[in-house]
Amino acid sequence: MQQLEVISILKKDLNFNERSIEKLKKFVELVLNENKNHNLIAKSTESSIWHRHILDSAQLVKFIDFKLASLADLGSGAGFPGLVIEIFNKNKDFHVKLFEKSPVKKQFLSKVIKELDLGAEVYGDVRNEVLDADIIVCRAFKKLERVIQVSREIAK
């Protein structure tokens, strides 16, 4: 599935607006550029980034109640799914919290947030943070048992 097909799905089925699509395009550009120097995503998935990473992350917006206060993305890595959700987010009172222990990835996440003028916040290793969240998401973070354990510790 190519970029244009994914964008069509994002607009029609998931209600992404044109502003969000433009931010996603810039986000993809930033990920691919940074991936030349640091392993943010597997090189083998670069050509399928729109389907494998963007659409896979974006499908979560159907299940998120943006009237709640916050969402935590555990092991955010390159920002999937947290930054995709933040790009979609239209509620200024809804906060996306990105948890990432890698200093390189934390720096990248902060750069994306600044360049795209997003409201997400970056935190360090989830084990060292005392934060709460209404919704917890993750993608390729840990084994399910560990995800549940960490979720219990930070969920409201």
Residue ranges of model-derived segments:
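S-adenosylmethionine
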Residues: 82-84, 91-156
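Class I SAM-dependent transferase core
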Residues: 2-68, 72, 104-118
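Acidic, metal-associated active-site segment
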Residues: 57, 80-83
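Short, charge-rich binding segments
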Residues: 63-65, 87-91
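Class I SAM-dependent methyltransferase "Motif I" SAM/SAH-binding loop
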Residues: 75-79
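Conserved beta-strand elements of the Class I
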Residues: 72-74, 135
